[in-house]
């Protein structure tokens, strides 16, 4: 027993707008009284119209427009899964494993058979599609990218040792607080030559006062303007030049007065009696004393500077401008320019060498640009249009040839003529399509001609010996082939295309579209046939 599910009549009509709907079966499933009255007036595919039937038809149409009419459906619709089957066929083209490709084709053929019968529910078709993608994903997993392994190692570089020294610092700070108060003060040193007392025990880290500012660094003063900074720099330069020749002899003697941090307590020299417990660790050394300020030099007691030696006028530097001249220039806003120094003749680069250097640089840049443009043009995809508008290469492909080969290639990728045949036929067809695909990416005239010859050979290889559309209809009911067997009709149209009978294929498709004007497959094949016919005529006329 089939499971019934209800849906609105409006959504049912939208989903099945490309399918043939039986009127008697449709009105039987609509759950309204008006639909049942209309169904009772259908005799031999003919509706008997009267006043009551017309009123019921108007009421039903109003309910469908307002989305108030519902119906029950038992089977799945073919149009929901048709696009999925087309995508699956395109994916199988890139599979090179023969056994896997054959199993994928068997799954596609089984789904198409169920869709043509129309007695399977959506869940079964969904499971079959899921099985197809499971097989296809396993085929892709077996080929990992080569850079997957180095990328996975990058996150393993971790530096966890950064916060480790934090607890050790805390222990060093707490040890002096526990040991120093219990230790006796050190006795005076027996050395009579050193009058300095032993250093006091260092305070704990928590009791240390903040470090005083360095005496040599003055506090930052208020910001000065440009004139004051210039005057201050001139004064410092004059003081530095005055103190430069002064070298006091007492400086080395005064630099050795700081020896207090090197004194050790007496207990470090005397032997200690053995004890059961280990001796406590010695207290840490006191922090180093701040550097001593430079000794003050008394200029009055310093020896006079050595007498200046007269230099020749050529070796003397130019006199520095006086302070009054600098201030007057700053007030007036005029600044004297320094005289330009003449470059020696040996350092001057001749003009001819400069032009040669510029020409070499431009030539290298133009060559790199040409190489980049050549690479970018070879990477154009087959979907780009107008790719050769700005290409002036002598070997560029003709636009009608490119469109003709692309249309024929698209017919082969979605063809049903060779998908369910023997494995040898499928293997040869897919190998040829795999060879044609890189030729379409680099669209030169040579590659397009090669692709065209390969596709024409493949067309003659997969063409049927007899086309069903050429034989007349047999029987009293002369129904067209697309009504009785749509899958065979698709194969017959593709056979006409592969035999280059584009006009016959176009006539059959136009006739089929009179019955089903919105059918997706009919419109797609008609578009390909028209492209092939037009571009073939252009190619023959240009040749």
Curated annotation (Swiss-Prot):
The gene is P61. Residues 375-384 have a biased composition (Polar residues). The lineage of its organism: Viruses, Viruses incertae sedis, Naldaviricetes, Lefavirales, Baculoviridae. GO terms for cellular component: host cell; host cell cytoplasm; host cell nucleus. Residues 226-246 form the WH2 domain. InterPro entries: WH2_dom. The keyword Glycosyltransferase does not apply. PROSITE patterns: WH2 (PS51082). This is Protein P78/83.
């Amino acid at each position: 027993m089939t499971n019934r599910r209800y849906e609105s009549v409006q959504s049912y009509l939208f989903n099945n707008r490309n399918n043939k709907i039986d009127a008697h079966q449709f009105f039987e499933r609509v759950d309204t009284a008006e639909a049942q009255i209309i169904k009772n007036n259908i005799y031999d595919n003919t509706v008997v119209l009267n006043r009551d039937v017309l009123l019921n038809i108007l009421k039903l149409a109003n309910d469908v427009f307002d989305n108030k009419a519902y119906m029950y459906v038992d089977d799945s619709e073919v149009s929901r899964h048709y696009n999925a089957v087309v995508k699956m066929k395109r994916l199988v083209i890139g599979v090179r494993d023969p056994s896997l490709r054959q199993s994928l084709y068997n799954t596609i053929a089984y789904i198409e058979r169920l869709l043509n019968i129309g007695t399977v529910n959506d869940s079964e078709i969904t499971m079959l599609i899921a099985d197809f993608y499971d097989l296809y994903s396993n085929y892709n997993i077996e080929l990992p990218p080569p850079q997957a392994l180095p990328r996975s190692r990058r996150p393993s570089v971790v530096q966890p040792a950064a916060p480790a020294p934090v607890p050790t610092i805390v222990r060093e700070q707490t040890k002096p607080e526990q040991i120093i108060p219990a230790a006796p003060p050190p006795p005076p040193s027996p050395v009579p030559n050193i009058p300095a007392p032993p250093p006091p025990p260092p305070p704990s880290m928590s009791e240390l006062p903040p470090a005083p500012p360095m005496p040599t660094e003055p506090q930052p003063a208020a910001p000065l303007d440009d004139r004051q900074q210039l005057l201050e720099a001139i004064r410092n330069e004059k003081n530095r030049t005055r103190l430069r020749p002064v070298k006091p002899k007492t400086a080395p003697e005064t630099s050795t007065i700081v020896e207090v941090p090197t004194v050790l307590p007496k207990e470090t020299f005397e032997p200690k009696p053995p004890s059961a417990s280990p001796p406590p660790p010695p207290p840490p050394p006191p922090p180093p004393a701040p550097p001593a300020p430079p000794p003050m030099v008394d200029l009055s007691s310093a020896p006079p500077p050595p007498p200046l030696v007269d230099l020749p006028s050529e070796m003397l530097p130019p006199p520095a401008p006086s302070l009054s001249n600098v201030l007057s220039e700053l007030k007036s806003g005029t600044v004297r320019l320094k005289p330009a120094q003449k470059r020696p003749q040996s350092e001057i680069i001749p003009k001819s060498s400069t032009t040669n250097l510029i020409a070499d640089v431009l030539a290298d840049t133009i060559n790199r640009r040409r190489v980049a443009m050549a690479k970018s043009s070879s990477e154009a995809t087959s979907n780009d249009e107008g790719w050769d508008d700005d290409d002036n290469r002598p070997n560029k492909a003709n636009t009608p040839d490119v469109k003709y080969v692309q249309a024929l290639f698209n017919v082969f990728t979605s063809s049903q003529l060779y998908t369910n045949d023997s494995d040898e036929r499928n293997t040869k067809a897919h190998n040829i399509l795999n060879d044609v695909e890189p030729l379409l990416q680099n669209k030169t005239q040579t590659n397009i001609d090669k692709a065209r010859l390969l596709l024409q050979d493949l067309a003659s290889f997969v063409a049927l010996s007899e086309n069903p559309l050429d034989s007349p209809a047999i029987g009293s009911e002369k129904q067209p082939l697309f009504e009785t067997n749509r899958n065979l009709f698709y194969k017959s149209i593709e056979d006409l295309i592969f035999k280059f009978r584009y006009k016959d294929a176009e006539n059959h498709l136009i006739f089929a579209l009179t019955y089903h004007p919105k059918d997706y497959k009919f419109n797609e094949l008609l578009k390909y046939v028209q492209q092939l016919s037009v571009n073939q005529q252009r190619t023959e006329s240009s040749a």
